Amino acid sequence: FYDLAEARHAMKDSGFGSPVMFLGAEGSADMAAAEIAELLKVCARNGGQDIGPDGAEGWIGRRFDFSTIENVLNSRGGVAETIEIANTWSGIGGTYDALTKAMKPFADEVLGHFSHAYTDGVSLYVILLGKADDPAGAEARLKQIWEAANRAVLDSGAVLSHHHGTGIARNDHVREALGSSWDLYGRLKEAMDPSGILNPGKLGS
């Protein structure tokens, strides 16, 4: 499910005028057809419009094409980053609004899509594409991006990461995110790694 900005990339159509969701079903032909028919009914009841299979079929063939991001990174001062987080269904709308708003000052394009979905929530990817004056400026921009992103995520009640891990960019905010669980994780790490040799400077440090 792609927001308007990323839908234009997913559809390879710079004039595409709405968010887009690609639907698929697995199983026997009859079962898959029945599932798709029901999904389309749900979409229609919520204002969606069936635009046919061409967009999804084209996307399937290029969904792992990262050349747009690679081209940005290969340019002098290019800035590209992916931020993935998660929240409940009731909270993800507020998180999306807060995070995309917080990122707009730092990028030429702010793209968003939902990826992994569950009964109780969903993960959100926000992709940033932009340009600084030089590599040093790009590095400084990335630090600003992560500070603003982490703040927006936590303030909106989301979790810092879905499945990519926290990494160094989120490390300063992990204690706040974990709350009282921080002490438990710290004690577990001390018990398993009393000499502090496993991935030093990361979780629990």
Where are these regions (language model features)?
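C-terminal substrate-recognition/cap domain of FAD-linked oxidoreductases
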Residues: 1-148, 152, 156
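General beta-strand structural signal in soluble alpha/beta enzymes
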Residues: 52-53, 162, 198-199
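Single, functionally critical "micro-switch" positions that shape active/binding sites
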Residues: 87, 163, 192
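Small/polar glycine-rich anion-binding or flexible loop at a beta-alpha turn
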Residues: 117-120, 160, 165-172
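Short, loop-centered acidic/histidine patches that primarily coordinate divalent metals
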Residues: 127-131, 163-166, 203
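Short amphipathic alpha-helical interaction segments
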Residues: 137-141, 145, 166, 176, ...
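Short basic/hydrophobic patches in alpha-helices and adjacent helix-turn junctions
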Residues: 148-159, 175-176, 187-190
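Activity-critical C-terminal alpha-helical subdomain
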Residues: 167-205
